């Protein structure tokens, strides 16, 4: 009996130690409000080192004005690169217009990339407009457009992007069917990989409970596939995950860049890193720390190189922390309130203004 008691105590102690190593809370940062919009729902954020702060607005509803803006103070905004590029309407080509921009991103060379899935209201791609766009730093005009028309079905939705400046490759998530898109930026060749692989599909058994209830759509559990994506500072590893479960995966980018690998060989190179949080976006800093959200817990966490997870901030204002950008020693965070959209609340729109961008010191 005594031995059994000691064993039980040791088991509880070890469990506590493991839990602590899983999430070490070393004190919280404070959120600093950088931008707010009282009318239009934003998703993406991109901060230029010592420069501009941009946000984007997907065309998810009829309450819509511009796709991409440069912010001016906490409420001001200017359409980017101009009003005309932001003025698309049904029936027009989407190749040189912003149709439904999902993400904006500065690579480490300071080049701005704009990702447009071109699927208004998350429906079908319009005007052959699904594209990744590289902007010219000097003229703020479109330098090159990579159209996804050759490889995407009309029902696809490209979600997020990371660019390897040295190797000239881009990696993107596709969140409808699940998968990764690999783009050779030099010659424009692209391909879809890991399509409907277990690492790009949300775990059907995971209950995505947020605000005290499982998120539902059309009477069924809401499932979001491959979404967040992050590239290690050396460009050797791509980290990614489905949104609506807590698993995290990675794969060596050399395998993604090798078109000679069979689908089966490539899938065998995926590494399952374990359980962490449900997050939308994620991003590495230059030291190799990975920052993610916790949609269910209203917090931002950091994973170090040993995958030790630390809470940086927990705050009720973090209503669906969506996208991330790092500049000037800060982590910038957009909050999009997706769980409060009417399709997840029996047709009732529970979103409240403002939609926000915060930052925390890192």
What annotation goes with each model-predicted range?
Residues 74-113, 117-121, 125, 144-149:
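Blade-loop segments of beta-propeller domains
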Residues 39-50, 92-111, 115, 151-169, ...:
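Beta-rich, blade/repeat-based domains predominating
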Residues 55-61, 114-117, 172-176, 232, ...:
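Conserved beta-strand positions in repeat-built beta-propeller and related beta-rich domains
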Residues 76-86, 143-147, 191-206, 258-271, ...:
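Beta-propeller fold detector
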């Amino acid at each position: 009996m005594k031995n059994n008691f000691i064993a039980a105590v040791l088991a509880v102690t070890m469990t506590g130690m493991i839990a602590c190593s899983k999430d070490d809370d070393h004190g919280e940062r404070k959120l600093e409000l950088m931008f707010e919009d009282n009318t239009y729902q934003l998703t993406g954020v991109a901060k230029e080192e010592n420069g501009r702060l941009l946000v984007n607005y997907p065309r998810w509803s009829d309450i819509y004005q511009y796709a991409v803006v440069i912010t001016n103070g906490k409420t001001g905004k200017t359409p980017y690169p101009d009003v005309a590029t932001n003025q698309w309407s049904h029936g027009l080509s989407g190749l040189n217009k912003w149709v439904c921009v999902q993400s904006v991103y500065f690579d480490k060379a300071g080049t701005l990339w704009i990702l447009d899935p071109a699927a208004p209201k998350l429906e079908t791609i319009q005007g052959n407009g699904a594209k990744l766009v590289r902007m010219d730093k000097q003229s703020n005009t479109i330098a090159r457009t990579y159209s996804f028309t050759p490889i995407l079905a009309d029902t696809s939705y490209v979600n997020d992007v990371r660019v390897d400046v040295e190797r000239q490759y881009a990696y993107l998530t596709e969140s409808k069917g699940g998968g990764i898109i690999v783009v050779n930026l030099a010659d424009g060749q692209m391909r879809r990989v890991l399509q409907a692989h277990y690492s790009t599909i949300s775990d059907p058994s995971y209950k995505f409970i947020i605000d005290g209830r499982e998120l539902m759509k059309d009477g069924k559990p809401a499932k979001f596939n491959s979404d967040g994506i992050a590239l290690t500072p050396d460009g050797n590893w791509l980290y990614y995950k489905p949104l609506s479960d807590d698993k995290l995966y990675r794969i060596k980018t050399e395998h993604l860049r090798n078109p000679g690998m069979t689908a089966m060989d490539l899938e065998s190179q995926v590494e399952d890193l374990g359980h962490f949080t449900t997050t939308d976006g994620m991003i590495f800093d230059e030291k190799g720390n990975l920052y993610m959200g916790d949609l269910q817990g209203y917090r931002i966490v950091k994973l170090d190189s040993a995958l030790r997870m630390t809470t940086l901030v927990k705050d009720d204002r973090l209503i669906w922390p969506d996208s991330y950008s790092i500049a000037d020693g800060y982590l910038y965070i957009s909050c999009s309130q997706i769980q409060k959209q009417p399709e997840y609340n029996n047709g009732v729109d529970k979103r409240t203004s403002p939609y926000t961008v915060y930052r925390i010191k890192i």
